[in-house]
């Protein structure tokens, strides 16, 4: 059902954001507070007189952090979204992206009805069809693929908050082990595998840093304040305000580097050398926590011998830092231990040797005695709730994701019903990683180790996500069938055979959000309004496909409410009870070593922190990290660095009207001396060409002293070629187009993408 377009200008957006912040600064909170408190304070509410205000609970989907939100709607229209004060992540606050959620929902460019392709792949020519036609056609194509090649010939890519239904539930019921999420091999897998090798525990989606009591933090290439995860931004701001020491290692003076006590403008690709020198200082000057390591770690003697040559003087020549800077920062960390941490970071797939770099970071944290200590790193704990009572899936644990559940990682490789393992090379191309989404492209082209003939892309802009775009396009041309499920007509949608338009988070129920955390919790998502146009929720699509494919035994539930209540009954709750509890169920955690009463929480083979890794040694890898040099930029080229912007998420939000108004296109950060040499000034349009001849669209120069002379930087997600996106199409330049090369991490399967170089072209 169509709704009246919601008219919100930037001025009204900022005004309503301030009003929401004022309301949520109050100490009291109940199911009806946000509006009533604002009314009591005499603050204007432009929508207040339109009708009865309805309050519902959800989790935000404007970035992967999924903060709890309180949604206000009037007469079937969402008018305001605020952070849920009961939610451990949002704590009553939202970033600009979260506040702009209604603008995303009411984007007039949204997909409105199911479609089937009528033109050539990539032309974007479709006809609108009924849901019955689209689902019947999709089911028939999947049946044909399964009968001819087996269920494993269907790959499922999933991202955003609803990916559970396709990349987990459907993929496992159908029987394909080839489900993958970019949050793993294109983002976090090196940190997860390194943490598991070192501590026996992955990091988890929420980095377990005990910010409230932290006295010294180190950020290596982590752009807090630009990456703008709500909770982390709050935590950092509070820690910084109370005087915590901040060390930032980054080739660029990022926003957070500008707040640091020490900024180390390191040469890109040399971070591991710096961390090894820190270890050298901590051990050589006996600054480490001896009692902690004696009780909880193994391999100290091997580590000491290994790092003896890696002096600050050795690292200084490699990193372009001074030996004194390296010593002083190591001593600063030690001075504040154990309330001293190198924050793991999130996007860590950089150079292809990233698991070993992350291992070195975790070794420093162990030397500081930080893990399991107040003010250091706490133990994440998953909330308890039972799965929906379905029969055993045809395949289990196939999709990867941001991280495994802490303490629950399995050494077993998922297998399909035919006994075939994943086609991405897990346990053969790379040692430990659960998935490598980018490695599923090759079987689509070559059929090795077996053919992948169909792709389901849920919420993944395939062309703006996976490195080596020409290879991805080649794969999409060869596939027999592509299904795109999305809210917007992103670039890859033009390549689909069937397009299914999804309802947004304000229009649907979704799977429960279970969060491993210091205080583990469960959050709900319920619809605030009816879906716009002819859109449907993912759970409904999956169920309808399952019934058409003979998978009825997995879909005994008829509604999302029935499914969710069947899960919640295992903890004595229900959807109605969750509503009464402000949409969140909080459980008890065990964050510190003292909570384990002398028992080891470390799930390595030795039940201790393994500074020296026997598993890596046995597999033929360095058991203690070493520095591996990366390639230098060719003459006339710069290393291409990329990152985030506080009002945008990946390539998802560039078309959102309010956020587009705040930041419409990216810029090229170029060292001002280099700009002068090239005769360039701020605002000049240039083009970039990489080492393989791939060329970007035009991008404006930002000449600045805030970046090294050997690198350039741009925000990811721009330069989209999607005519259906009236605001984002053709704005800025795409970093993904320039990432034709990547290096596979042989341990985690992560794709190191910072090995690309670009030259600047002033005219084309």
Language model regions located:
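Extended redox/cofactor-interaction regions of prokaryotic respiratory oxidoreductases
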Residues: 2, 166-237, 242-249, 272-276, ...
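Short beta-alpha connecting loops at secondary-structure transitions
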Residues: 258-266, 503-510, 520-531
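Long, contiguous, secondary-structure-rich segments that constitute the structural scaffold
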Residues: 528, 532, 537-583, 653-669, ...
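N-terminal export/assembly segments and adjacent metallocofactor-ligating motifs
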Residues: 2-287, 299, 313-314, 322, ...
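N-terminal leader/propeptide and maturation segments of large enzyme subunits in energy/redox metabolism
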Residues: 117-133, 287-323, 528-600, 662-664, ...
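Glycine-rich phosphate/diphosphate-binding loops that line cofactor/substrate pockets in enzymes
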Residues: 135-152, 207-216, 306, 327-341, ...
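Acidic/polar loop patches that form or flank catalytic/metal-binding clefts of enzymes
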Residues: 180, 289-290, 326-327, 340-342, ...
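Flexible glycine/proline-enriched surface loops and loop-helix/loop-strand junctions
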Residues: 120, 217-220, 259-260, 310-314, ...
């Amino acid at each position: 059902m169509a709704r009246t377009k919601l008219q919100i200008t930037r001025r009204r957006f900022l005004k309503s954001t301030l009003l929401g912040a004022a309301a949520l600064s109050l100490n009291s909170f109940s199911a009806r507070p946000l509006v009533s408190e604002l009314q009591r304070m005499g603050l204007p509410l432009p929508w207040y007189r339109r009708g009865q205000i309805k309050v519902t609970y959800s989790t935000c989907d404007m970035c992967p952090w999924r903060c709890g939100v309180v949604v206000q709607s009037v007469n079937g229209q969402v008018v305001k979204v605020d952070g849920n004060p009961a939610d451990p992540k949002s704590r009553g606050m939202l970033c600009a992206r979260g506040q702009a959620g209604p603008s995303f929902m009411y984007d007039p460019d949204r997909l409105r009805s199911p479609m089937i392709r009528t033109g050539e792949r990539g032309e974007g020519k479709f006809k609108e069809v009924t849901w019955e036609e689209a689902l019947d056609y999709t089911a028939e194509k999947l049946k044909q693929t399964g009968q001819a090649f087996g269920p494993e010939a269907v790959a499922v890519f999933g991202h955003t908050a609803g990916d559970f239904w396709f990349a987990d539930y459907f993929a496992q019921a159908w029987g394909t082990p080839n489900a993958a999420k970019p949050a793993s091999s294109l983002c976090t897998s090196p940190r997860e595998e390194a943490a598991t090798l070192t501590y026996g525990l992955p990091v988890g989606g929420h980095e377990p840093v005990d910010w409230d009591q932290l006295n010294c933090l180190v950020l290596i290439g982590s752009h807090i304040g630009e990456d703008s995860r709500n909770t982390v931004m709050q935590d950092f701001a509070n820690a910084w305000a109370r005087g915590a020491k901040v060390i930032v290692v980054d080739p660029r003076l990022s926003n957070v580097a500008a707040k640091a006590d020490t900024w180390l403008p390191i040469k890109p690709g040399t971070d591991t050398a710096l961390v090894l020198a820190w270890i050298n200082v901590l051990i050589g000057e006996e600054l480490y926590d001896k009692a902690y390591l004696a009780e909880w770690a193994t391999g100290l003697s091997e580590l000491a011998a290994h790092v003896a040559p890696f002096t600050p003087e050795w690292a200084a020549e490699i990193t372009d830092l001074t030996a004194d800077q390296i010593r002083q920062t190591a001593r600063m960390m030690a001075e504040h231990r154990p309330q001293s941490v190198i924050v793991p970071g999130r996007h860590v797939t950089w150079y292809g040797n990233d698991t070993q770099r992350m291992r070195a970071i975790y070794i420093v944290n162990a030397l500081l005695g930080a893990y399991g200590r107040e003010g250091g790193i706490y133990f994440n704990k998953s909330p308890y709730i039972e799965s929906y009572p379905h029969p055993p899936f045809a395949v289990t644990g196939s999709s990867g994701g941001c991280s495994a559940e802490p303490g629950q990682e399995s050494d077993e490789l998922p297998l399909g019903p035919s006994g075939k393992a994943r086609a991405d090379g897990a346990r053969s191309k790379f040692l430990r990683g659960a998935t490598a989404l980018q490695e599923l492209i090759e079987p689509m082209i070559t059929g090795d180790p077996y053919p992948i003939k169909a792709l389901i892309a849920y919420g993944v802009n395939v062309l703006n996500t996976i490195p080596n775009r020409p290879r991805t396009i080649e794969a999409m041309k060869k596939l027999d069938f592509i299904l795109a499920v999305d809210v917007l007509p992103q670039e890859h949608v033009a390549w689909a055979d069937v397009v299914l338009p999804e309802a947004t988070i304000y229009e649907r129920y979704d799977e429960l959000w279970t969060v491993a955390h210091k205080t583990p919790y469960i959050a709900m998502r319920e619809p605030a309004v009816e879906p716009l146009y002819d859109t449907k929720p993912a759970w409904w699509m999956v169920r309808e496909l399952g019934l058409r494919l003979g998978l009825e035994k997995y879909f005994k539930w008829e509604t999302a409410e029935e499914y969710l209540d069947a899960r919640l009954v295992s903890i004595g709750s229900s959807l109605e009870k969750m509503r009464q509890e402000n949409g969140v169920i909080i459980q008890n955690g065990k964050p510190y070593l003292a909570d384990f009463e002398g028992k080891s929480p470390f799930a390595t083979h030795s039940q201790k922190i393994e500074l020296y890794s026997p598993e890596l040694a046995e597999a033929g890898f360095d058991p203690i990290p070493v520095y591996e040099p990366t390639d230098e930029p060719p003459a006339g080229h710069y290393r291409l660095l990329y990152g985030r912007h506080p009002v945008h998420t990946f390539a998802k939000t560039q078309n959102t009207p309010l956020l587009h108004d705040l930041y419409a296109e990216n810029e090229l950060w170029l060292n001002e001396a280099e700009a002068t040499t090239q005769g360039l000034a701020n605002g000049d349009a240039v083009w970039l060409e990489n080492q393989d001849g791939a060329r970007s669209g035009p991008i404006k120069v930002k000449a600045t002293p805030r970046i090294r002379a050997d690198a350039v930087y741009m925000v990811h997600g721009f330069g989209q070629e999607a005519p259906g996106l009236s605001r984002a199409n053709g704005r800025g330049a795409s970093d993904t187009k320039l990432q034709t090369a990547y290096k596979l991490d042989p341990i985690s399967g992560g794709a190191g993408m910072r090995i690309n170089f670009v030259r600047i072209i002033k005219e084309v």
